[in-house]
């Protein structure tokens, strides 16, 4: 089983891109340092110096300058963006998330905001990996604090059988069980992504699934009181058997009688429903009528669509986001009403795009924008006194109308505007009156 730590690879891409992105000369940095020392209260001076340090791969100094700028103006979108890039370069995942989210609030360059939104998908994966590492580092401490018996982790099932095309059911079947268990208000089900990150970290994935009595370490690290695991067996070409067990993490004992059933392959969803209802009994959960009815919902009526979906989950776990999105898309083609596959496809596409985001690609999208002018100023050793706070839609439209204001963002051509690079009469995409309206109210006071 290949385990591709996509977010680690993506982080390396971001870090490597720093070395090939726009650089700032030592002379320019010295000039900016003098300007900052002369006006330590200037947010613009701190912002420009921080960007220059970042471009020179002097990340600790960049962080300090950008933090000072952010304290002076928390609404400065450019500062938020470069704080996020700096945090990623320093492997500060939480800091990167906070800064990127601030950029989504206050940034004005639409293309870059789209990139950062996609990048946050990768940041979320990195957060799960970080949490897994921290949990393992604190394992002895966590072992002394038992998880709540109402917190349940559903681990991948183990498939055995001749038809390897059914192997992705290890993930798909486990997700069905987790989804149905989460329909009870009495239980808290651990997110699948957290579980997978931990399994990767402690190499439980080597055995793929988790049978009764095993995986207790994973449950302890997840602070789950109980874990659910089991097997799916292909008895012949058309019959499946599922066995599932509830294990108490603290005592390592199996609770209840276990759940098992056997059905024809095309009755996979009936098989899962029978299993999960028995698991509720073993978990000591009495369902309400509404909860019982919701469990009867089926994600799809197409077995082929669900197999494609399960394969997508497998590929997603391996960090193969493009391939995963194709599998999810195949599931949607087989069943256009398969909403879970639609959502997973969107998520996989965002993750694939986010993994490709780099410092170079971000700065390329800044070229020719108002925000890009501040980057150009740092590159050339000049300080722009203009505030770079969030200007919202108005600034985004203005950037499209006359991008020459910031035409030197990455070209080194300066930041002083000359002639517009775009005929204002050509439109900007922001002049569609059906979607963007400006209201001017004139109040005249009578004498």
Task: For the regions a language model picked out, list residue spans one by one.
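Conserved structural position within tetratricopeptide repeats
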Residues: 34-37, 67-71, 104-105, 332-333
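Short beta-strand->alpha-helix linker/helix-N-cap micro-motif
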Residues: 146-215, 225-238, 253-257, 294-298
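C-terminal/domain-edge helix-coil "capping" segments
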Residues: 22-25, 105-107, 111-150, 250, ...
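Amphipathic beta-strand/beta-sheet edge segments enriched in Tyr/Trp
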Residues: 80, 91, 98-102, 209-283, ...
